[in-house]
Amino acid sequence: MLAKVYVTPKKAILDPQGKAIANSLHSLHYDEVADVRMGKYLEVRLHGLSRNQAEQRIEEMCRRLLANLVIEDFRFEIMEE
C-alpha cells in the first residue's frame, strides 16, 4: 500500500515561505495568485497491513513524527498498489 501524506501550516500560522513564493509569482506577473501555502508531501509504502491498519498506523506516524501538531495540519490518502 502507498500512503500519500500532506502536511501544511495551520491557517492561523504565518507562512513566510508561502508568502515569498506568492510575492515572486506576482513579480512574474501571475497577478491571479491570491495566496500560497507551502507544505510537505510524503509517500510512505506499507506492507503486511489491512487498509484499516494502514490508516491507523499512518495516523499515528503523522501525530508522532511527520507533522508538528502545534503549527501543522495533516491529511493522507491510502492507495492500493
Predicted regions located by residue number:
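Long, contiguous binding/interaction regions
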Residues: 2-41, 48, 52-81
